[in-house]
């Protein structure tokens, strides 16, 4: 199990990923695109980094929006893995 980050550490790190929001013990990012095809194309870009890190986001896809939620489920909150994945995903945008 990966170690949970302290609240102070979370608050410091969230400032480094300004396009993400902190919601309880999760990170949330909403990507708005032109249409459903672009939404699915964006989701497909997430597959390789998620598989490589063995850290998979929760996803919600609507017509022109992809909502991404990151948390380390087996740890019950936010860990280093979540912030690394958030930075990776932000780089794909």
UniProtKB/Swiss-Prot annotation:
It catalyses: (4aS,6R)-4a-hydroxy-L-erythro-5,6,7,8-tetrahydrobiopterin = (6R)-L-erythro-6,7-dihydrobiopterin + H2O. It is an enzyme of class 4 (lyase). The keyword Lyase applies. SUPFAM superfamilies: PCD-like. Keywords: Lyase. Pfam families: Pterin_4a (PF01329). The keyword ATP-binding does not apply. It comes from the Bacteria. One of its GO terms (molecular function) is 4-alpha-hydroxytetrahydrobiopterin dehydratase activity. InterPro entries: PCD_sf, Pterin_deHydtase. Its EC number is 4.2.1.96. GO terms for biological process: tetrahydrobiopterin biosynthetic process. Belongs to the pterin-4-alpha-carbinolamine dehydratase family. This is Putative pterin-4-alpha-carbinolamine dehydratase.
């Amino acid at each position: 199990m990966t170690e949970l980050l302290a609240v102070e550490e979370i608050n410091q790190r969230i400032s480094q990923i300004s396009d993400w929001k902190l919601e309880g013990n999760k990170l949330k990012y909403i990507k708005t695109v032109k249409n459903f095809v672009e939404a699915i194309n964006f989701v497909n870009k997430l597959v390789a980094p998620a598989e490589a890190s063995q850290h998979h986001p929760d996803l919600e896809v609507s017509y022109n929006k992809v909502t991404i939620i990151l948390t380390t489920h087996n740890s019950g909150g936010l860990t280093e893995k979540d912030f690394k994945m958030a930075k990776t995903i932000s780089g794909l945008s």
